């Protein structure tokens, strides 16, 4: 007998189905067939280099297989375990995990960070590695508070093996007081973003030659945090910002606005309802602690939450709303 595997491809705005004839696997092969990689955040703080990180994650080389016999111009990508991952154009340049993150070791020496966490997302189609820098951002204290916020600085690199994400290196910060995590709200703070083209290696090398500019990125980020912490905010100004970020009158939107307003003066988590920095923290606290993330057929709640915190779209939206209302 011959089994048929249906592969759906989008080409010229039309979905086409192709049938691959293959010999059916044995019972043993079916039993031993591997499931997609599940989301997990691995502690890699004892890793000296990228090879150590990838060894801890048990990552090998990915491979490709031509599909010209059924669809000219496409190929199949398999992960390091031989499992089918996705179908891409035959011109897609597959970057091996060791290639995709090799630059991080040089960046580690330049910036002085230590590898911290790493893991797979999107069922093994994307991989990230994050490092923690020694330097921190301290927000100026206010009033009788002896100490301001402490923000840890992270350097995070992400790539995909199916073209769904360019290789991206960006600055992220973690608020120590309450574990609010957020991507940088200024997309100009990306260290590099390189698409999966045939010249991606040369482009990445050029981007890393400018790595000394990362310290300027951190300086600009620190200066913006200081500006936010020095600008006092009235309750009515906060309400305007809240309405810009969460537009509409639905029950879901009202719930989000109410939760964020409660976070604006949540002293337990270090927000005091006084400054533009408190405003910003109200939204990141909502995103970190209050926003409901749901499980889907392919992703867990934990992965969806992790992915939302790594997305710069929400903090960028908040920062733009603050600028619109407060002109800072």
Protein language model regions, located:
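Intrinsically disordered, low-complexity regions enriched in serine/threonine
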Residues: 2-59, 119, 134-328
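A generic structural signal for beta-strand entry/edge sites
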Residues: 4, 74, 126-128
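An N-terminal amphipathic alpha-helical segment
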Residues: 55-70
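A short, surface-exposed helix-loop junction/capping segment
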Residues: 66-91
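Short small/polar-residue motifs
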Residues: 72, 110-116, 152-154
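Amphipathic alpha-helical segments
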Residues: 90-114
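A short acidic/basic microdomain associated with nuclease active sites
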Residues: 109-135
């Amino acid at each position: 007998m011959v089994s048929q595997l249906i592969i759906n491809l989008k080409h010229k705005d039309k979905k086409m189905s192709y049938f691959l004839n293959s010999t059916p696997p044995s019972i043993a092969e079916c039993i031993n067939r591997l499931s997609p990689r599940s989301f997990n955040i691995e502690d890699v703080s004892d890793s000296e280099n990228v090879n150590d990180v990838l060894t801890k994650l048990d990552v090998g080389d990915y491979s490709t297989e031509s599909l010209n016999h059924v669809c000219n111009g496409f190929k199949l990508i398999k992960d390091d375990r031989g499992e089918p991952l996705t179908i891409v154009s035959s011109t897609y340049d597959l970057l091996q995990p060791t290639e995709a993150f090799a630059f991080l070791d040089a960046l580690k020496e330049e910036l002085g960070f230590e590898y911290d966490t790493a893991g797979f997302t999107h069922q093994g189609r994307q991989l990230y590695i994050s490092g923690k820098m020694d330097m921190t951002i301290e927000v100026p204290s206010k009033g009788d508070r002896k100490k301001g916020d402490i923000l840890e600085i992270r350097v995070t690199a992400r790539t995909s093996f199916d073209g769904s994400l360019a290789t991206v290196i960006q600055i992220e910060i973690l608020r120590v007081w309450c574990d609010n995590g957020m991507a940088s709200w200024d997309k100009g703070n990306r260290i590099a973003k390189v698409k999966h083209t045939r010249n991606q290696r040369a482009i990445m090398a050029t981007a890393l030659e400018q790595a000394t500019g990362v310290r300027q990125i951190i300086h600009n980020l620190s200066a913006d945090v200081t500006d936010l912490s020095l600008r006092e905010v009235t309750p009515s100004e906060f309400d305007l910002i809240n309405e810009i970020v969460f537009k509409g009158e639905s029950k879901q939107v009202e719930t989000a606005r109410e939760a964020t307003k409660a976070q604006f003066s949540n002293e337990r988590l270090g927000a005091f309802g006084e400054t533009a920095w408190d405003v910003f923290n109200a939204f990141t606290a909502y995103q970190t602690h209050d926003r409901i993330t749901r499980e889907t057929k392919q992703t867990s709640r934990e992965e969806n939450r992790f992915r939302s915190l790594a997305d710069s779209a929400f903090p960028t939206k908040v920062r733009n709303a603050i600028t619109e209302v407060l002109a800072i």
